Amino acid sequence: QRYREFLIRCSRNYDHVFYVAGNHEHYGYDIARSELAIRAFVPENVHFLNNNDYIIGDYVVLGTTLWTDLKNNDPLVKWDVERYMNDFRVIRNNDRRFTPDRWWEEHFRSFQWLDKKLDEYNDKKVIVMTHHAPSIRSIHERYLHSRSFNTNYGYFSELDEYVEAHPQIKYWFHGHVHNSNDYMIGTTRVISNPHGYPDTDDQNPEFKFDLNLNLD
């Protein structure tokens, strides 16, 4: 209900709203059915992108959750993320447990789609929107030296070289981490501006409510 109310407010304030689902949308639900439930309640001018593209002006927007690659499907990483991350306790998968293997399948499917679309739009200006981050540079330094470092691979995929090889990507917007980012990978500007969990102390002190970007 809170998601629906938030999206309705956004739809009233903007002509176009682009929405990519994260991991929390699936909490308490079945990932195999969540997309249909979301599409059923989003307003008409809210573009829910789950491996979908949308052309607006001179830009093509490519949207996907892009679950991480778990360090190229590394068994030790899969063991650690399953042990420490809530996703595997509160998300269902066709009435069974959500597992690291299913997570990786979601990543593979999304990455294959993204790769195909970037080939298709190699002569266009592209905005990529994902929930998970495309680089370790988006991870706050306080997590880089933790004993559970491998759990960071549940937040990003190492796509720096891939992004540099696709200069048509002018912007890459992402969420998931609870810290702000604004940096360059080659000619691509990577930005995150998360609010953090509502009604908790886990919020981003650098969140900019009035962040505006003038696209070239």
Q: Where in this protein do the model-derived segments appear?
A:
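Core catalytic region of metal-dependent phosphoesterases/phosphodiesterases
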Residues: Q1-G57, E120, R142-A165
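Active-site-proximal loop/helix segment associated with metal-binding centers of metalloenzymes
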Residues: L62-I127, H132-N150
